[in-house]
Amino acid sequence: MISDESDRFNPRDPKPADAGKPSKSAKRREARKLATQALYQWHMAQHSLNEIEAQFRVDNDFTDVDGAYFREILHGVPAIKSEIDSALKPCMDIALEELDPVELAVLRLSTWEFIKRVDVPYRVVINEGVELAKVFGATDGHKFVNGVLDKLAPSLREAEVKANKR
């Protein structure tokens, strides 16, 4: 079949309207980064979530951030903190109180995603958690986070994990 000339790529054509805009996954990644920082602040300073959210929205450019996802994480994690911490404890050989606060924030965020956002594949949850730990955590913190999330996934996403091992 001969292609019509109009189907050919022309480098002089203007870019599509959405060219250069971050993808949904990129916006979510940025939301997770800010949420990790906000959860760390919540854990350390015990300020109200609304105060923290307002501060983050003033202090950060949310143009390339999924603001709704940021809010969902920031308010969602504390809402089920006891459930999250109960799920994490059997996967670690260290008490939650002894954990680095940054790694704790990452683990809580990732556990929340396992529990509440089943639309996000478990492998994505693990990968995003590891990446957050690389950015914000201690030198080898990402290895610890990876190990914990790897142990946690089968208990919170059993069917999905089994289906992916076939």
Swiss-Prot record:
<keyword id="KW-0805">Transcription regulation</keyword>
<keyword id="KW-0694">RNA-binding</keyword>
<dbReference type="InterPro" id="IPR035926">
    <property type="entry name" value="NusB-like_sf"/>
</dbReference>
<dbReference type="GO" id="GO:0031564">
    <property type="term" value="P:transcription antitermination"/>
</dbReference>
<comment type="similarity">
    <text>Belongs to the NusB family.</text>
</comment>
<dbReference type="GO" id="GO:0003723">
    <property type="term" value="F:RNA binding"/>
</dbReference>
<protein>
    <recommendedName>
        <fullName>Transcription antitermination protein NusB</fullName>
    </recommendedName>
</protein>
<feature type="region of interest" description="Disordered">
    <location>
        <begin position="1"/>
        <end position="28"/>
    </location>
</feature>
<dbReference type="InterPro" id="IPR006027">
    <property type="entry name" value="NusB_RsmB_TIM44"/>
</dbReference>
<comment type="function">
    <text>Involved in transcription antitermination. Required for transcription of ribosomal RNA (rRNA) genes. Binds specifically to the boxA antiterminator sequence of the ribosomal RNA (rrn) operons.</text>
</comment>
<keyword id="KW-0889">Transcription antitermination</keyword>
<feature type="compositionally biased region" description="Basic and acidic residues">
    <location>
        <begin position="1"/>
        <end position="18"/>
    </location>
</feature>
<dbReference type="GO" id="GO:0005829">
    <property type="term" value="C:cytosol"/>
</dbReference>
<dbReference type="Pfam" id="PF01029">
    <property type="entry name" value="NusB"/>
</dbReference>
<dbReference type="GO" id="GO:0006353">
    <property type="term" value="P:DNA-templated transcription termination"/>
</dbReference>
<keyword id="KW-0804">Transcription</keyword>
<dbReference type="InterPro" id="IPR011605">
    <property type="entry name" value="NusB_fam"/>
</dbReference>
